[in-house]
Curated annotation (Swiss-Prot):
Pfam families: KRAB. It comes from the Eukaryota. One of its GO terms (biological process) is regulation of DNA-templated transcription. Gene3D superfamilies: 6.10.140.140. It comes from Homo sapiens (Human). InterPro entries: KRAB (IPR001909), KRAB_dom_sf (IPR036051), Krueppel_C2H2_ZnF (IPR050169). This is KRAB domain-containing protein 5. Residues 4-75 form the KRAB domain.
């Protein structure tokens, strides 16, 4: 079993399937794909940006993207220390998501929380 790639977590729609989605479903799809890619990047598993991510960042329709392929780096030595670091990053990203899901849409009173996270170099995933 190799390393996880973006292709492993990406969902692809045909143009016809995409046309059946309403605007909220399309936005949710974009948010989920961007979050999945962000998680792979934070774990050091993505080294190139897939075309799909570029399209989603530009809010373009993704159905004409050729490939969701992302090349993963295969470490020469996958040490116990490296495994621990990856596990820690995944836990931090998951914790951040839980915090933001709970407080991210509550309005201006949480702007300070967001600024604090950004100032500490934490990645904000919406």
């Amino acid at each position: 079993m190799g390393l996880l790639t973006f292709r492993d977590v990406a969902i692809e729609f045909s143009r016809e399937e995409w046309e059946h989605l309403d605007s909220d479903q399309k936005l949710l799809y974009g948010d989920v794909m961007l979050e999945n890619y962000g998680n792979l990047v934070s774990l050091g598993l993505a080294v190139s940006k897939p075309d799909l991510i570029t399209f989603l960042e530009q809010r373009k329709e993704p159905w004409n993207v050729k490939s969701a392929e992302t090349v993963a780096i295969q470490p020469d030595i996958f040490s116990h220390d490296t495994q621990g670091l990856l596990r820690k990053k995944l836990i931090e990203a998951s914790f951040q998501k839980v915090i933001l899901d709970g407080y991210g849409s509550c309005g201006p009173q949480n702007l300070n929380l967001r600024k604090e996270w950004e100032s500490e170099g934490k990645i904000i995933l919406w």
